[in-house]
């Protein structure tokens, strides 16, 4: 037994010396970057974990959120860590296919390359078909939110800049693109170009009755902090790694509802949420999210799964929502795996999800993504699968 232990000890010493040699001159940057990334990721993970723990213990998400927003020191530490991760680690590993580039591509295709026109035309065909199938539908006075509001095709192409609101922006990555008039908001901004704003408690006012250039001027003069915004102000609202930050499904629901109010008709809600598992591991959860968000007056236009995240684009198809959304349990359908994890480590990069060592070190964000797999909600089929998706087979729906 002793020779075995001695041999094992020698082998471990050799491996240990090899690791040390990698940190000598010649390999310093890689070692330093890895250590820095571990430290920064730990800061972010602890904030998320502590929020969920407090919510499970107290159950009052409003009180917990207010206390969280008052912890300036920790919020500043979080903002600095997120910006450092984005600048020094995530951006270098995306190789041009990151979450920001995905948002840019979706917006360009939709607003400048005819995507919006095609979507509106499809709505018109769907409305005509529904009318033919239900001739007495309009006479009965029944409000059908599955039939989108049809708007004349006089604004299907964007003529000016895309007015974009980036919620939880941290460092306003969309500001560098000429296509966007970007407004970044965060509870604790990491840079001066981001306005301080608590989106959960943002007050929504009546829409502005201004010309487009006047609305652009209004956005350009916004100052921090932002406590209120007019409705129907933006063409795009982005939730990039935002919804999983909140410990309560109802908070995620509030965010999506506010996004619906802030978007113009046919505007886009882009949602990016972390997940390092394979594409089908949380397929039921993604279907549940789709149904819940569409109930607000959206229709999912695109879905993609990268190696570390889900990416979804929803189009606002109705100016109003139904009045009984809460009783239908839609808020609870915006769940994440961590909501049911009570065993301590509860983020997407925990060992129970069979992640690699490198993935365990990284926080819920995209690094080197796989090719995206667009999903057409209208057709019910994924481009990499011919199997249709029937919503009524979703176990979450059966439970609720």
From Swiss-Prot:
S-adenosyl-L-methionine binds at residues 99, 168, 186, 198-199, 240. Keywords: Methyltransferase, S-adenosyl-L-methionine, Transferase. InterPro entries: Bmt2/SAMTOR, SAM-dependent_MTases_sf. One of its GO terms (molecular function) is methyltransferase activity. It is an enzyme of class 2 (transferase). Its EC number is 2.1.1.-. SUPFAM superfamilies: S-adenosyl-L-methionine-dependent methyltransferases. The keyword Amino-acid biosynthesis does not apply. It comes from the Eukaryota. One of its GO terms (biological process) is cellular response to amino acid starvation. Belongs to the BMT2/SAMTOR family. Interacts with the GATOR1 complex; interaction is disrupted when samtor binds S-adenosyl-L-methionine. Interacts with the KICSTOR complex; interaction is disrupted when samtor binds S-adenosyl-L-methionine. S-adenosyl-L-methionine-binding protein that acts as an inhibitor of mTORC1 signaling via interaction with the GATOR1 and KICSTOR complexes. Acts as a sensor of S-adenosyl-L-methionine to signal methionine sufficiency to mTORC1: in presence of methionine, binds S-adenosyl-L-methionine, leading to disrupt interaction with the GATOR1 and KICSTOR complexes and promote mTORC1 signaling. Upon methionine starvation, S-adenosyl-L-methionine levels are reduced, thereby promoting the association with GATOR1 and KICSTOR, leading to inhibit mTORC1 signaling. This is S-adenosylmethionine sensor upstream of mTORC1. The lineage of its organism: Eukaryota, Metazoa, Chordata, Craniata, Vertebrata.
């Amino acid at each position: 037994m002793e020779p075995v232990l001695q041999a094992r000890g020698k082998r471990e010493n050799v491996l240990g010396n090899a690791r040390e040699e990698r940190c000598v001159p010649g390999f310093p940057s890689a070692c330093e970057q890895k250590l820095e990334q571990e430290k920064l990721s730990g800061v972010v993970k602890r904030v998320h974990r502590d929020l969920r723990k407090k919510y499970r213990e107290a159950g009052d998400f409003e009180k917990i959120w207010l206390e969280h927003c008052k912890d300036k020191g920790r919020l500043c530490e979080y903002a600095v860590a997120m910006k450092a991760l984005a600048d020094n680690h995530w951006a270098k590993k995306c190789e041009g296919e990151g979450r920001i580039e995905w948002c840019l591509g979706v917006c360009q295709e939709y607003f400048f390359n005819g995507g919006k026109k095609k979507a509106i035309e499809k709505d018109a065909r769907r409305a005509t078909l529904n009318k033919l199938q239900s001739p007495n539908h309009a006479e009965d006075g029944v409000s059908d939110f599955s039939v989108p509001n049809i708007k004349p095709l006089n604004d299907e192409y964007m003529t000016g800049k895309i007015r974009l609101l980036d919620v939880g922006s941290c460092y306003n990555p969309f500001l560098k693109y000429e296509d966007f008039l970007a407004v970044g908001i965060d509870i604790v901004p990491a840079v001066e170009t981001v306005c301080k704003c608590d989106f959960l408690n943002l007050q929504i006012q009546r829409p502005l009755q201004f010309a487009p250039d006047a609305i652009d001027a209004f956005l350009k003069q916004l100052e921090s902090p932002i406590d209120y915004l007019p409705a129907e102000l933006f063409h795009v609202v982005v939730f990039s790694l935002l919804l999983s930050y909140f410990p309560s499904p109802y908070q995620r629901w509030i965010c999506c509802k506010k996004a619906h109010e802030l978007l113009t008709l046919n505007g886009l809600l882009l949602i990016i949420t972390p997940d390092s598992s394979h594409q089908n591991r949380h397929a039921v959860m993604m279907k549940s999210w789709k149904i819940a968000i569409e109930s607000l007056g959206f229709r999912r236009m695109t879905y993609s799964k990268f190696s570390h995240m889900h990416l979804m684009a929803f189009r606002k198809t109705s100016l109003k929502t139904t009045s009984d959304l809460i009783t239908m349990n839609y808020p609870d359908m915006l769940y994440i795996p961590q909501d049911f994890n009570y065993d301590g480590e509860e983020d997407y990069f925990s060992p129970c999800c069979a992640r690699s060592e490198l993935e365990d070190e990284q926080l819920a964000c995209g690094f080197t993504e796989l090719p995206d797999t667009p999903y057409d909600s209208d057709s019910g089929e994924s481009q990499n699968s011919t199997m249709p998706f029937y919503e009524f087979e979703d176990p979450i729906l059966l439970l609720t």
